[in-house]
């Protein structure tokens, strides 16, 4: 029984973000090395700058008025500590993937089943389109549990 339990525990993992590229191509490249200012959104992400650092992405964001720096690894969870003084949301793990048009980020709160997914892409008018999809939320439901917001380049 113990052997079966260990095998089961070793097989458990959160789903990785969609996308097959680790480096930006075509339209997705427009998201990098530029400050993006977002419209109002459920996660209170005010701005973000994505920077490639090897096979990981550095994310410098202003979230609810606070400057945060975190990292995402390609289809692998990278642990971050965004709220060191709040044990209830202390550690987040972030993974990313891309396709030719979009950047996909998955964020999981360690030691919980909470996960949220972000998709970002640039439309033909040079506007950033973003979606946020949590697996659970306190917010009123949206169709398909997906919230949409936009951003502009500074």
Predicted regions and their residues:
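Catalytic loop of the DD-peptidase/beta-lactamase superfamily, centered on the K-T-G motif
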Residues: 1-91, 98-101, 108-154
């Amino acid at each position: 029984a113990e052997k079966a339990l260990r095998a089961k525990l070793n097989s458990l993992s959160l789903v990785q973000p969609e996308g097959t590229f680790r480096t930006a191509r075509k339209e997705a490249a427009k998201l990098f090395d530029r400050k993006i200012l977002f419209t109002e959104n459920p996660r209170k992400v005010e701005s973000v700058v994505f920077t490639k650092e090897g096979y990981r992405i550095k994310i410098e964001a202003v979230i609810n008025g606070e400057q945060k720096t975190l990292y995402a690894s390609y289809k692998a969870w990278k642990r971050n500590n965004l709220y060191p003084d709040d044990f209830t949301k202390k550690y987040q793990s972030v993974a990313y993937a891309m396709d030719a048009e979009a950047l996909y980020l998955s964020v999981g709160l360690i030691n919980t089943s909470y996960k949220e997914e972000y998709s970002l892409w640039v439309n033909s008018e040079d506007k950033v389109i973003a979606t946020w999809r949590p697996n659970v939320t306190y917010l009123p439901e949206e169709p398909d549990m997906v919230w949409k917001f936009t951003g502009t380049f500074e």
